[in-house]
Amino acid sequence: MKIPKVYNSKEVEDKIYNLWLKSGFFNPDKLPKRHQKSYTILIPPPNITGELHMGHALNATVQDILIRQKRLQGRKTLWLPGTDHAGIATQVRIEKELKKEGKTRFDLGREKFRERVWQWKEKYGNIILDQLKKLGCSCDWSRTRFTMDREYSKAVKTAFLHYYQKGWIYRGERPVNFCPRCQTSLSDLEIEYKEEKGKLWYIRYPLKPITSGTRRAGVKPKTFLVVATARPETMLGDTAIAVNPKDKRYKNLIGEKVILPLIKREIPIVADRLVDPKFGTGAVKVTPGHDLKDYEISLRHNLAMIKVIDEKAKMTGDIPSIYRGLETIEARKKIIEDLEKFGLLEKIQDYKISIPKCYRCLTTIEVIPSQQWFLKMKDLAKMAEKEVKSGRIKFHPKRFEKILFDWLKNIKDWCISRQIWWGHEIPIAGPNPENVLDTWFSSALWPIATLGWPEKTKDSEKFYPTDVLSTARDIINLWVARMIFSGIEFMGSLPFKDVFINPTVLTKEGKRMSRSLGTGIDPMRLIEKYGADATRFGIIWQVRGGQDIRFTEDNIVMGRKFCNKIWNAARFVMLQTAKSKVKSQK
């Protein structure tokens, strides 16, 4: 065999990858018979809207190293690829295309819009899988799955009905995170926070005359209770004032009432452990309809939930007509003016505030009461916690177990419905339902649905449970935890044995990589310039015990030089063996 003098990565890698594909050895069914004991990795399915970024490249390289090592060791290896339908992300992408045409999804209607998304998916949905092939990934492409293919959809429907028949899925009204632009509910894990300069407004709530039995001798009764808030517009929905039970300043006021400014509704003063005595004056407004912590307080004190902000972030409900229909920021200005006019604004203070943003469109999130579908989480969380604590599933590095345990310990029922058009329709909601299922509901079934569940298949018998999950820290709760309890609930065993949490790839300066911020690095450019092997080597070379990576292209250059050395060494050996009497082995 003659090896060219110059190493041309593109020519060599394309030729060798095509030989691998032709051999069929990425498919475990076509491996030699000596490969009996299975070894399985399921690729975390990238969004159909996605293109390869450095995080994908690192994760795919880690998985490929593991799968190739086990294949060489004689294991029956399955590395199963696929993509996620990515409900909100995909819908936002198509809506942007429609906007360029001067249209909205409402102009098309639900069914035509879904047809448009399917057409887009067929055209662009496999781009990232093609890029993974360019990276050299040895997945079994014949088993590629999509989270909305026919068999996968059957699994999602079966899982929903299973939970529903157990009484674990219910429909109810609760405050939820809501995106006014996407017009859908979001989980806490689907929100990004942006710190901004804001204000704290100190508002006087007139005290209802205190009953004589609670007055302390020699103490002058207060006229007002001063409350600090960063969102005065929500005060129209207040149903209580809360203080910490250990706060001596307000001990004699617990159980009394104040008059809600501008509304003139009597609301009680309650004691609750959630109140931070160091925030503002130590007395806080309780607005159960528009704050998730306030909702928790309301459950303990049997407080009403009043809706004063609607799905379009406008004021609504039984409030003075001068505020109704105003956007929240406009209402805030008007309310502050009126409080000043009535002498009920004590002071204003500069304050840094974390603003919740939609993770897809970055619109400011509103918490609003809404009818949604929920999955009870208490029993599922207990199952998952027990299994992880038993040591039957191991996290690497181990410190990431704490993220999982903290979430499971403080678990809340999961809002599984979304008010979008692209996704799995809720099985019992009837034709053309208003809601679809949260994308993570279907993603939670990935280890079992891809192997054939709810049917008993050869793949599920041979390859479940899988061996390794390699993923990122930011989806431990969104995805990893949910796959764990889904595997236990539906298959009776854990879906994987080891969880590798990869480091985050940062810029050389330590900043987050982002194409939109101009700090992203395109792995495809590196592959084109240096080759896939050099890119893989350069990325993996920087991994150090789970610590985040400050990426530098110098390591890819080093990888290229290493590939050259291997090439030249191989060429030298081949030249020498050609001169000798040693026969090459095929």
Write out the residue ranges for each language-model feature.
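Short beta-alpha connecting loops at secondary-structure transitions
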Residues: 104-115, 316-325, 519-524, 548-555
